[in-house]
């Protein structure tokens, strides 16, 4: 079997979830959309089922996968429904539903439902993706209450720059939300991962930890709470070939790298088809048999190359950590002008191996 694999530490996942609740004192929806950010939604939900207050996914298809796997906790559909016909399924499977636009509100008013919905009414407090504008929010709230189709309303919004702790935008959004929701009945959900960790004064009855669950910091600098996160995924593979090359020899596509001296080059079974970034630069950190090493040469579809010259004990079968406890995925992503969300979600071909269930 090809040695590339993603090790998933479910005990670390539970630790990170508990940290989110400890930091806020609020109930927490574990965000496991996009197949739990590449970690496997069903297995992550099963690992958290005994303690999670609920889960959040992007769409009904993701919710149905969880229900079919036996997950019975509340599941929030973060984008709501895309067609009015989905309302029947939402009721049948007891999903909670975000309502963020006029046509969704109208569809609920017209629907004949077997029982009332639990709705999360979303305000666009300044991110400008989806949600009712502040001046329209109270009217939408009143229409939902008057419809007779809704059992409970949670009022929510989403911060666009909470990962920038010195940026005033979060306080501006909070002020807009507070003004527009004043006097309206319902619980509040405002805090995403960076707000859970870095904005303790933001009120929330419910929080929505996402990237922090998987042990990746949303911040570019050290933070005392973020530093307590544990990485859930370790991406690793093995050396499958060793080349002894003299100085001046090209390595890989485009001859981007040439040996600087007599070097031992290890070929690792990992490439961009697995989700490792093709544009990783020469010198990118890897760990070889538990010691720091470096990538050299261009990443190809199924393989990449590392410098084994200063690792005399390394050779065929040596373990190479691409990201994980020794190579933080957030720091790695920043080197490529990317974000940890993208790297984690891009893993499609690598099998997962779970521990800590």
UniProtKB/Swiss-Prot annotation:
GO terms for molecular function: alanine racemase activity; pyridoxal phosphate binding. Substrate binds at residues 129, 301. It catalyses: L-alanine = D-alanine. The active site is at 33 (proton acceptor), 253 (proton acceptor). This is Alanine racemase, catabolic. It is an enzyme of class 5 (isomerase). Isomerizes L-alanine to D-alanine which is then oxidized to pyruvate by DadA. Homodimer. InterPro entries: Ala_racemase, Ala_racemase/Decarboxylase_C, Ala_racemase_C, Ala_racemase_N, Ala_racemase_pyridoxalP-BS, PLP-binding_barrel. The modification N6-carboxylysine is found at residue 122. Keywords: Isomerase, Pyridoxal phosphate. The modification N6-(pyridoxal phosphate)lysine is found at residue 33. Belongs to the alanine racemase family. SUPFAM superfamilies: Alanine racemase C-terminal domain-like (SSF50621), PLP-binding barrel (SSF51419). It comes from the Bacteria. GO terms for biological process: D-alanine biosynthetic process. Its EC number is 5.1.1.1. Its cofactor is pyridoxal 5'-phosphate. One of its GO terms (cellular component) is cytosol. PROSITE patterns: ALANINE_RACEMASE.
